[in-house]
Amino acid sequence: METEYADVTGHDVTTIICLCGNTVDGEGLIQANSEGIPVHGDDSTPVPAGLAEWPEDEDIYTLCPKCGRVYRDAVIEETGTAPVAFRVDAASGPVAEAIRIHWEQNP
């Protein structure tokens, strides 16, 4: 299977236009870990159940909650391209629950 690529401007992960059409300003994109689980980015509060801790190695991914495509931020920042790293089930299961929790924490 060929690698899919999202559109991105420069080397800026906040400009990703996911293959499904979602953007940061659309339905939103979420910072995630290497398993596609949304991470808790506020180190002043405990990590809510269901979310992942911020990775110690700072290896962050961007999750599209609309379609489940996941992009590796380091690749985008280094190459200016946004290949899909992998996909997760954003509609059901633990990732879907983590997405729900993320939006509750970040309305």
Which ranges hold each PLM region?
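Short, charged surface segments at domain edges that flank catalytic/cofactor-binding sites
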Residues: 2-9
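Short recognition patches in nucleic-acid-associated and regulatory proteins
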Residues: 12-55
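Intrinsic disorder/low-complexity segments, especially N-terminal tails and targeting/processing regions
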Residues: 15-18, 62, 90, 101
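Short cysteine/histidine-rich metal-coordination sites, predominantly Zn2+-binding motifs
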Residues: 32-44, 79-92
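Compositionally biased, non-globular sequence tracts
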Residues: 42-50, 61-68, 94
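Short Fe-S-cluster ligation motifs
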Residues: 48-56, 93-107
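Acidic, low-complexity intrinsically disordered segments
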Residues: 53, 59-83, 87
